[in-house]
Amino acid sequence: MVISKRAGGRRAAGGAAAQAAPPVNRGIAKADWREGFKKPQAGVSDMTLLTQITNEAVNDNLHKRFSNAEIYTYIGNVLISVNPFRDLGIYTDEILRSYRGKNRLEMPPHVYAIAEGAYYNMLAYKENQCVIISGESGAGKTEAAKRIMQYIAAVSGDTTGTGSTSSGIHTIKDMVLATNPLLESFGCAKTLRNNNSSRHGKYLEIMFDANGSPVGATITNYLLEKARVVGQIRNERNFHIFYQLTKAASPQQRELFGLQGPEAYAYTADSQCLDVPGIDDHADFAAAFEAMRIIGLTDDEQMSMVRMLATILWLGNVHFVENAQGDAELANPDVTAFCAYLLEVDPSAVQRALTQRIMETQRGGRRGSVYEVPLNPTQAAAVRDALSKAIYNNLFDWIVARINRSLQAQSQTAASVIGVLDIYGFEIFENNSFEQLCINYVNEKLQQIFIELTLKKEQEEYAQEQIQWTPIQYFNNKIVCDLIEAKRPPGIFSALNDAVATAHADSSAADNSFMQRTSMLSSNPHFEARGSKFLVRHYAGDVMYNVQGMTEKNKDALLKDILNLVDSSSNAFLIGLFPERPDPNSKKRPPSAGDRIKASANALVDNLMQAQPSYIRTIKPNQNKSPTEYDTQAVLHQIKYLGLRENIRVRRAGFAYRNTFEKIVQRFYLLSRATSYAGDYIWQGDARSGCERIFLDTGIARDEWQLGVTKGFIKNPETLFALETMRDRYWHNMAMRIQRAWRAFMRRREESARRIQRAWRRSREGHEFLELREYGHQLLAGRKERRRFSLISMRRFMGDYLDLNGSSAEGRMLRASANLPPNEPIVFSARAQLLVSRLGRTSIPSPRFLLMSPRAVYILVTHLVNKRPQTTCERVIPLSTIRQVGLSTLRDDWIVLQVGTDEGDPLLHCDFKTEFVAYLLQQTGGRTHVVIAPQLEYVRKGRKKAHVSFRKDESIPVGDVYKSSIVSVGSGEPPTSVSRPPAKKLPRSAQPSTKRRTTSRPVTSRRPVPTVLPTTTASRGLPPAPGGTASASALAVPTTSTVAPASSASGNASGARHVPAPPPVSGGSGLPPYLQAPATSAPSSGMPSYLQRAVPAAPTAPAAPAASAAPTAAQSTSGIPSYLGSSTTKLAPPVTVQQLGSSSTAQTRSVPAPPSASATPAVATPALAPVKAAPLPPPPPTGRRLPRYRALYDFETQEAGELPLRTGDIVELEEKEENGWWLVKKGSTEGWSPADYLELIAEPAAAKPRPPPPAKPASAKPAAAPARVSQSSVTSSWTPPDSHAAPVAVMPGMGDPGGFAAILARKKAERAAAAEQAHVPE
C-alpha cells in the first residue's frame, strides 16, 4: 500500500472542482423560463417602425399600447407619454436602477431613459442639456418633470453605482427634490381637466461639476395665475395650499391666525369644490412643511408665510355694502379688524385703503392736489382682490427666490447644466381671457422651438452641409407667434398696451379701444375678430378669447393706496414682499403683464436654444381622467397639432447624430489606430479626413454616415451607441492590457516562489507521518517481525483511512453511526476484523470498522436489516480504560486491547496495527503498556480467560490464518528491519501524460517490446488484480491481423512474425527489482496476494532436444519465469496498455512483477539455435478469471460507492462480504451491489489445444498457417521481424504445442537446408 496523501483528499478536491465547474454554453445564454410569462408587447415601441405613416396609424399604435398599460413610445429620441390616470408601478427604485448606464435601445421606452440620455450626454460631451415637456393641460407634464428630477438626483454624484455620495451632494439632491412638493402646493390647483394642474411655469436648472455631481440649482418662475386666488369657476379649486392649511393647520396656527375650515372662506368655498379624489390635503401639507425644513426655511419664515396665507383668506371674507350716497361701506368691520391684526397695520388704514382712492392731479392749475375719492362696492371689491392677488403673487416669488438662495449657497462653479421645463399646457375653456392667451402664447413658443430644432433647422442644416435629403413639408407656427408678440406690424400684446395707454382710467373704454385696434390684425389668416371676442387659430386648435377685463389684467398695476398700506405695516416680512416701487418722476410707461410674459418667454427660448434638447410630448387620453377610457378623436387632434406624423417622417429620413469634424475626432479618435496611439492623437491630416478614417476603421457601413462641409452625420442611433460603447471600452481594454502584463509578471514571480516552496515541501512532505512511523518502529523495539509493505519508503501513517474527517459519504455514515459530534476529530479509522465467539464452534473473525478519537475507540458493525445494510456502534472503549495492548512476535496483524471489563477484551485483526498502536500511545501520552509475546492472554465475555498462540507456517504466503486459538502466519522481515530509503524520482516526461500519443503505431523505445501473437487465452486476458493493477498476461495484446499465407511474402515463407531477442546486458541479473524473482522457488512470504495472482506460474520446461543447448542448473533454479526470457536479457520497462493499443479489458497501468531478493545470482543463457522439429512445451496454465455474475433486477444507487445495475448486466466479482454486499466490477467501474441481485454465470470448459499438423517432405512447399482472427478489435504494435532469431513463446498462451511456433521452427530449418544445398558445388 503506497499512500502519499490523506484518504479522501483527492476525491474531495475533485468533487469540489467538479461542482464548481461552470456549464459549457459556448457563448449562448441559457433560456429563461420566465420569458414565456412576460406580457406581450403591443404595437411598436418606436413609431419610426410603423409601416404606414399616418395620423390614424399613430393613434392606433398609441391606443394599443395604452390598453396594454404601456404609456411610453418613442419617435426616435422623442418620448411620447400618454397619461394613464393611475399608478402603474413603473417608477420603483429597481426599475430606476435598471436604466442606469443603458442607452435608449437597450431598455423599453421610459422617462428614465430620457433622463439617462440627458445626463450621459452632459458628462460625455460637456454640453448643457434641457428636457422640454409639452402637451395640453392634464397630459402629465408635471409628473414627467418629477420623474426626471427623481432619476437625476438618484444617479448623479454616484460614479461607483453603489448609491454612496458625499453629504454635501446628498443635501443638494434632497433640496432639489424638496422643491416639488413645495411648489406644487403653492403653484398647482384643481381644474376641470386636471386635478393637479400647474398654474405657473417652472424651469429648473440643476448645476453639475465636472464629475457629474450636483452643486446647485436655479428655478425660474413664469406667469403665476394669480387671478385664481380670488375666484374660480364651478368645480375648480384655489391653490392647494389654502385647502391644506385650513384642513391640517396645527392648533397653535389656528389659535394665532384664526384659521377655520375651507368652507368658512369665500376664496375657497365659492367654487363648491373642497375635496378632490386622490388628493390627501393633510399628507400634502405635512410634505410641504417638511420640504420647507429641507430647503432651510426657518420657523419664523414659515410662520410668516402662514400669516400671509391667513391674511388672504380673511381678506376674501371682507364684504361691502352700498350707503345712501352710493359709496362702499364695510359690511363686517370685525373681519376687517382681524385682517389689520394679521397685516400688523391700523384698522382704519385698512378701511381707507379698501373704500377710498387717493388721486393726485397731474395737470391744470391745481396740479399736485390730492383728493380722496370714495369707491363703490364693486370698485372696493376689486381693490380687495388686487391686494390679495398681490400678496400671494409676491409670496410665491419670494418662495422661489428663497429656494434659489438656499441652492446657490451650496453651489460652486458649475461645469454643466440640465434644465427641466414644467410649464402649463395648452388650454381651451368656455371663457378664455388674458391668462389663457398668455399660457397658449408660451406653448406656441415651445412648439416653435420644437419645429426649429427638429424640423426646420435640421432640414436647413442638411441643405447647408450638402447632404442628400428629401425635404419634408410641415406647419411652421411662427406666424401665430408673430400675431401675438410682434411690434411691427403690431400684435395682440402691442394692441393691448396701446389701449391701456390711451384709456387707462376706464377699463371698459380700454377694452373697446383694444377691439378697434385689432382690426389691423384682420389680414393675418390666423386671427378673426367677432364683436367683443376674437379668435386665434393656434397650432393646437382655435381658441375664442373674451375681451372684457383683458386690458385691466394686462395693466397689472397696484394702486398707490395699497402700497401705502403695506408701508405702514410693522411686519418686516410683508414689507419685504413688495420691494419694487414705481418711480413717480419717471415718464416711462411701466411694463405690462404682456410685456413681462413676452420677455420671460423669449428669455426661456434663448436658454433652451443654448442647450441640447430632449423632448417629451405628453398626450391626454380623455377629458374624464379615466384610467380605461381612450378618446380616439381627442387623441387624434393632439397628434395632429403636436406634429407627430411630420416628426416621424423627418426622423426616418434624417440622421440621428451630427457634429463638427473637430468634435467627432476629439470624441472618437481613440477608435482608430491611424489616429491614436496609447491615448495620444497622432493624425497628421485635417479633421475631415480624420473623421473619415475613424468611420472606416470602426467598420461602419457606408450608408450609415455622411460627411458634409463642416460636420459629420450618423444615420441611426444604434451606430452612435456602438461607437460610444467602443469608446467606453477603450480605456478598460488599455487597463486590462496593463493588468494582464502585471499579472503575468506577478504570476511568474509567484510561480517561481511556489516552485521553491514546492521543492521544500516535497522534501518535508508528510514529515509528521514519517515521524509517527518511526515512533511505531520504536514501539516494536525490534521484537516483532515486520511485513514487507510496512517497510516501503512511501509507507506513511495517515490515520483516517475511512475519511471521517472529510466529506465522503462513507465517512459521514460512519460518523453518524458512532454518534460522533461534528467537532470531534478522528485520529484513526480503518477496516478491521473482530474475533467473535460462537457457541459450540470455533471463533471466527468478523468484519468491523475500527475508529479512534482523542477520547475513545469505537467498533462498528454492519448487519442486514430488511436486506439492507445498517451500520451500528457495537462498542465504545474509552482510552482511559485500555490498560495494555498485546501484539505477537510474528508478522501477523492481531491486536489485543486489554480493558478489564465484563464485555471482554477485543481481539482485533487490522492491517494497520502498528499505526493504530502508535496513535493510541500518542493520544494516551504513552501511558498504555505494549506487550509483545508469542502467546497473548485476553479475557472473553464474562471474564473468562483465553489465550491465542502464534506460529510460523511457510505454506501461508500472504496474511495469516486463525483456527482454534492458533494464528498461523508465514515468515516476515527481520524484527530489526527499518523502512526503506525514499526511492529516487523518475525524470519527468517532456509533455503531460494526457497528451502522449496512444495510437496503434509501434511504441518507440530504446529497447524493443515483445510482440504477442493472438490466442484464445491471450485475447481474453486476465481480469485486473485488486487495487487496479493489471495481471501479467494482460500485457499480451491481441492483434486483429491474420497470419499471412506462405505465398504472401518472399523473404518469410511462413509469414510469421519473429520476436527479436532483447540486447544482452553485462553483469547483474538484468531485471529490475520489481521483476526479479526470489532466490527460492517458494513464493515470498511478504508478497501480497494480488501480486502473486498477477504473475502466472512458470511453465514446466520439456526435455531439450539434442541439437539445442542444455540449460544450466542455475537457470533451472533461478525462479525467473520462462516467458520473461533469460536472466541475462535486459527486459524492457513495463509498457502501459495505452502504449500498446490494448483492448478495453486491459488496464492502463503497467504490470509490476513480483519483487525478488537482491541476492539472486545472474545466470547467462545461451542463444537458442534453430532446430528442425523441436517439441514445444505444454501451454502455461491460463490466468485465473474472476467469477462473472448476471444482474437479475435493476438496482438504483442510494449512496456513493454503490454500483448501479440494469437487468442483464454482466459483472465480475472481486470481493464478498458477509453482510450481503459484494464488491463487483462492470467494465472499468467498480462498486458495491447486493448479492441477492446477482446470478452466477457458468464458465464454458477450456478448449483443448490443437494437435500439430503432420510432417511433410522437405521438398514440398510448406502449407500456410491457418489464419486465426483475434477476438479483440484493437491492433497491437509490432516490431520488425528478425530472420536470425529463433521463434519462442514470449508470453504464456501465445502459442500451442506443435502449432504456430512449431511451423515457424520447421520452416526455418527447411530454409537453412535448402540454402546449404544451393551452395554445394557440383
Swiss-Prot record:
Purpose of the protein: Type-I myosin implicated in the organization of the actin cytoskeleton. Required for proper actin cytoskeleton polarization. At the cell cortex, assembles in patch-like structures together with proteins from the actin-polymerizing machinery and promotes actin assembly. Functions as actin nucleation-promoting factor (NPF) for the Arp2/3 complex.
Name of the protein described by the UniProt record: Myosin-1
Subcellular location field: Cytoplasm, Cytoskeleton, Actin patch
Bias-annotated ranges (Polar residues): 1078-1087, 1137-1148, 1269-1280
Family as reported in the entry's similarity comment: Belongs to the TRAFAC class myosin-kinesin ATPase superfamily. Myosin family.
A Gene Ontology BP annotation from the UniProt entry: endocytosis
Organism this protein belongs to: Malassezia globosa (strain ATCC MYA-4612 / CBS 7966)
Residues modified to Phosphoserine: S369
Classification of source organism: Eukaryota, Fungi, Dikarya, Basidiomycota, Ustilaginomycotina
Cystine connections: none
Domain text: The myosin motor domain displays actin-stimulated ATPase activity and generates a mechanochemical force.
Domain Myosin motor: 42-728
Pfam (any one): Myosin_head
Domain TH1 intervals: 786-980
Post-translational modification summary for this protein: Phosphorylation of the TEDS site (Ser-369) is required for the polarization of the actin cytoskeleton. Phosphorylation probably activates the myosin-I ATPase activity.
GO cellular component: actin cortical patch; cell tip; myosin complex; plasma membrane
Chain spans, region Disordered: 966-1090, 1137-1162, 1246-1300
Composition skew (Low complexity), residue ranges: 1000-1017, 1027-1056, 1257-1267
Molecular function GO labels: actin filament binding; ATP binding; hydrolase activity; microfilament motor activity
Residue ranges of the region described as Actin-binding: 417-499
